[in-house]
């Protein structure tokens, strides 16, 4: 059996620095439509749960990765933050009225779309200034795992009025729930 000397703290720091440079310096900025659905997103903390959208006949579940979870109301969401939103159809009765459960909330039906919203330095810079949402990019997916034909400019236009809230809907509600 051959024993190798243990790595010195200095060698470990140098290796970590080189690894960081190699993984961050070469990664090109993401563009709309390029974000994949993270395989483990359902294990992430919920940003908001069972968001009721009777106007859209939808129920939404919104997850955030741990990086986004560490955000603060005063500082916004940092680079590396990712949100995943599942949009479900609200179940409807035969007469077209929406079903509600014993709690008075809409009942989830079929999954319609999975949207991903991610933020990192330099992302979204290819977007025309009037629709740019800081460093956020968007992607839409079908329940089958195929890319959805949705135009991400629709996402951008919806989030654009929220520039003071880091372009995130229900920002205040989320941070109020953490106090």
Where are these regions (language model features)?
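Bacterial N-terminal signal peptides that target proteins for export
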Residues: 1-11
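Short, structured beta-strand/loop micro-motifs enriched in basic residues and often containing a Trp
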Residues: 57-68
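Sequence context surrounding c-type heme c attachment/ligation sites in exported
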Residues: 24-57, 74, 78-179
